[in-house]
């Protein structure tokens, strides 16, 4: 009896540990200056899920604003200014360089990226999986000063994670790292 209880407890522990897996890689350019004002472009959608790129960009804007450490340009203003220049904000792959877009928008930095995975993985229980990459470009120099690549699998066990929750947590983690590294320290 004790043996079967220990086996059951061990199985629950293993499922809990492996129920939510993530991989994160982040980098900050040494000596990079503080972000004064950032424009977040719609993220490129490399998935089959409609609007995954737009959702990722919106989540990052919300999370950056929530920190209070970085001034974020209103996404509707970004879209309007791009349209006035005959650029389609809904097609991030065809936009000019981030430096050129940043000069047009009069911001210090431009944040852009891609959603590489946004789906439920089939199996015994469908598991949400989200992958995103992001880059922050200093408009003055044209250099990438921050990058992040996150992949996360939610838990189908005990705590039912959905795609939106996994993506929101990922955006929160990216925004926290970015604001810690390059945001206004007085706002933290």
State what each model feature region is:
Residues 20-36, 57, 101-105, 124-127, ...:
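C-terminal/domain-edge helix-coil "capping" segments
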Residues 43-50, 85-89, 122, 156-161:
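Second-shell loop/turn segments in exported
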Residues 128-132:
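Short, surface-exposed coil-to-beta transition loops
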Residues 34-37, 47-107, 112-114, 147, ...:
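N-terminal segment of the mature soluble domain
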Residues 1-9:
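Bacterial N-terminal signal peptides that target proteins for export
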Residues 43-46, 70, 75-78, 115-118, ...:
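Solvent-exposed coil/turn segments that connect beta secondary-structure elements
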Residues 8-18:
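Bacterial N-terminal signal peptides
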């Amino acid at each position: 009896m004790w043996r079967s209880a220990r086996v059951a407890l061990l199985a629950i522990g293993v499922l809990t540990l492996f129920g939510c897996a993530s991989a994160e890689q982040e980098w900050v350019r040494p000596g990079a200056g503080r972000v004064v004002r950032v424009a977040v472009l719609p993220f490129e959608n490399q998935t089959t899920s409609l609007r995954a790129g737009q959702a990722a960009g919106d989540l990052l804007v919300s999370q950056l604003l929530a920190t209070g450490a970085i001034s974020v340009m209103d996404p509707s203003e970004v879209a309007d200014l791009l349209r006035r220049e005959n650029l389609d904000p809904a097609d991030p792959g065809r936009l000019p360089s981030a430096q050129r877009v940043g000069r047009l928008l009069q911001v210090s930095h431009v944040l852009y990226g891609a959603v590489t995975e946004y789906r439920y993985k089939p199996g015994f229980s469908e598991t949400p999986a989200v992958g995103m990459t992001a880059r922050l470009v200093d408009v003055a120099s044209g250099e990438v000063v921050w990058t992040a690549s996150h992949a996360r699998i939610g838990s189908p066990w005990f705590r039912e994670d959905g795609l939106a929750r996994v993506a929101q947590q990922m955006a929160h983690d990216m925004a926290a790292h970015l604001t810690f590294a390059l945001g206004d320290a007085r706002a933290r």
